Amino acid sequence: MAKHLKFIARTVMVQEGNVEGAYRTLNRILTTDGLTEVISRRRYYEKPCRRRQRESYETCRRIYNMEMARKINFLMRKNRADPWLGC
C-alpha cells in the first residue's frame, strides 16, 4: 500500500499539452523527496570512509537545523514577555 501511495504522489498529469510544466513539477517533487540526491550519490561507488563522513555531516546538519528551528520558533512566539519593557 505504501509503495502505491508513493507512486501516486509522484505521478504528474500533463494538462493542455504542457509537458515542460509537468516536467518541472515532477523534478520539484523528486527534489523535495530527496530522490535526485540519492540517485546521483549511487551513480558511483562511495568509499566507506567517505560514507561515514557524509553521514556524520548530515547528522550534524540535521541537529543544527532542528535546534535553529526551535530557537526561531521560540523567538516568533507572540505571547512571550517583552524583554525590553522601557524601550
Curated annotation (Swiss-Prot):
Q: Does DNA-binding show up as a keyword for this record? A: no
Which keywords does this chain's UniProt record carry? Answer: Mitochondrion, Ribonucleoprotein, Ribosomal protein
Task: List the InterPro entries hit by this protein, alphabetically.
Answer: Ribosomal_bS21 (IPR001911)
GO MF assignments: structural constituent of ribosome
Its predominant location is mitochondrion
| BP-aspect Gene Ontology terms | mitochondrial translation
Protein's cellular compartments? Mitochondrion
Q: Which Pfam families match?
A: Ribosomal_S21 (PF01165)
Q: Does the keyword Ribonucleoprotein apply?
A: yes
Cellular-component GO terms for this entry: mitochondrial inner membrane; mitochondrial small ribosomal subunit; mitochondrion
> Quaternary structure?
Component of the mitochondrial ribosome small subunit (28S) which comprises a 12S rRNA and about 30 distinct proteins.
Q: Which family does it belong to?
A: Belongs to the bacterial ribosomal protein bS21 family.
Supply the name of the protein: Small ribosomal subunit protein bS21m
